[in-house]
């Protein structure tokens, strides 16, 4: 890798470290930055998170400069900046079913969400169907407060 490439990588890593929230409960702050094409003459298709439309959208990157809201694929953008769908399941009654510890949805694999149960957080499979009645459930980190009612 050339020294210019290493400097660019170092710059992006420094920017990422500065813009990542300390709490880990929200998407990285760079997700709210506008699309920035950069200073070179290239025309590389990339994706950025548009905080106004709340979607990952395509733009053309020049190949140098720009900011960290710049992803090679729409999936990378979505995984980094969009909250995962679904809600956390009710707290498991049985012991031994604990999932991986997490800080936010983005630290959980696949469609799992980061759920808080009595002060501990763990990755759990998201629930997508409507509840038959109003139920008190734990919540995904960064969305509705724990213990809030989930309406039908």
From Swiss-Prot:
Q: Where in the cell is it found?
A: Secreted
Q: What is its main location?
A: secreted
Q: Where is the WAP domain?
A: 81-127
Q: Where is this site: Reactive bond for trypsin?
A: 41-42
Kindly name one Pfam family recorded for this protein.
Answer: Kunitz_BPTI
Q: Name one GO molecular function term.
A: serine-type endopeptidase inhibitor activity
Tissue specificity field = Expressed by the venom gland.
Return the Gene3D superfamilies for the record. Elafin-like (4.10.75.10), Pancreatic trypsin inhibitor Kunitz domain (4.10.410.10)
This entry carries the following GO cellular component terms, namely: extracellular space
Q: Which InterPro entries match?
A: Elafin-like_sf, Kunitz_BPTI, Kunitz_BPTI_sf, Prtase_inh_Kunz-CS, TFPI/VKTCI-like, WAP_dom
The positions making up the signal sequence are 1-24
Q: Which residues carry this modification: Pyrrolidone carboxylic acid?
A: 25
Q: Cystine bridges: which residues? A: 31-81, 40-64, 56-77, 88-115, 102-114, 108-123
The family this protein is said to belong to: Belongs to the venom Kunitz-type family.
Task: Mention any additional remark.
Answer: May code either for a precursor which is processed to form two individual classes of venom proteins (Kunitz/BPTI and waprin) or a novel toxin with two distinct domains and having a new biological function.
- This chain belongs to which protein, by name? Fused toxin protein
Organism for this UniProt entry: Sistrurus catenatus edwardsii (Desert massasauga)
């Amino acid at each position: 890798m050339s020294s210019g490439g290493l400097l660019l990588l170092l710059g992006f890593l420094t920017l990422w470290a500065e813009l990542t929230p300390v709490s880990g409960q929200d998407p990285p702050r760079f997700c709210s930055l506008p699309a920035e094409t950069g200073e070179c003459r290239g025309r590389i298709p990339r994706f950025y998170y548009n905080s106004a439309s709340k979607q990952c959208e395509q733009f053309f990157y020049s190949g140098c400069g720009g900011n960290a809201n710049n992803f090679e694929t729409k999936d990378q953008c979505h995984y980094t900046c969009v909250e995962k769908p679904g809600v956390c399941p009710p707290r498991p009654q049985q012991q031994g079913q604990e999932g991986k510890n997490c800080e936010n949805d983005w630290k959980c694999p696949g469609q799992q969400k980061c759920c808080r149960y009595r002060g501990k957080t763990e990755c759990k499979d998201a629930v997508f169907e409507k509840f038959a009645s109003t139920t008190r459930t734990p919540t995904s980190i960064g969305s509705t407060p724990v213990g809030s009612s989930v309406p039908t």
